[in-house]
Amino acid sequence: MKQIAELLAPAGSVETMYAAFAAGADAVYIGGSRFGARAYADNAESESLLDAIDYAHLHGKKLYLTVNTLLKEQEMNELYEYLLPFYCQGLDAVIVQDFGVFRRVREWFPDLAIHASTQMIMSGELSAEKLKELGATRIVTPRELSLNEIRSIHKSCDLEIESFVHGALCYCYSGQCLFSSIAGGRSGNRGRCAQPCRMAYSVEQNGKVILPQQKGYILSPKDLCTIEILPQL
């Protein structure tokens, strides 16, 4: 039996969640006040998120919480206290990058669905099979994968597969970029990316400018747009 795909949208705030659901999204992923990959976004506070979970369920929708950064060892106990209220409220799934977080969530909340973030760089069949073995219910494929690579993973493993179909692209492999850390001391894997790849740069060769800075967005890829291959996806 052919399944209908879930339309999932990012929600940078609770207000954005309302708009996404009104526009037809089946689910949203949203960051809270801690441990998300968008530390400088208008993230929801805990009370607002608890209300958002209720709102989603009241309207037959789902809400997934992002914990898609690398955590320090001393933050693990704080993570438990952070997640517990959302779990008790009926959170549908948590999206994780860190394998340590993955293990702890599995131990603390055995029945909570875990989605393996694109930041985990799950790029092949063996990775998918291992994540299933560990207890993942869904894998989010890296934006770098081709349609054939996604198809191959789907054929080899019966995990749910989530793929981005529109939006910005990083110039580096998902979860592997250190540019922001090196250039500005802000780690993308801690949710603090300064996005230096979006800045303009000049290109010089032998002391001569061959591409002026005002035309030099050389590290900023064009946005992902898969509308022409949505039927195949």
Where do the language-model regions lie?
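Active-site pocket-lining/capping segments in soluble small-molecule metabolic enzymes
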Residues: 2-122, 148-233
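Acidic, glycine-enriched active-site microenvironments
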Residues: 113, 135-140
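Conserved nucleotide-cofactor-binding alpha/beta core module
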Residues: 124-126
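Active-site loop and adjoining helix of the penicillin-binding protein/serine DD-peptidase-beta-lactamase fold
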Residues: 144
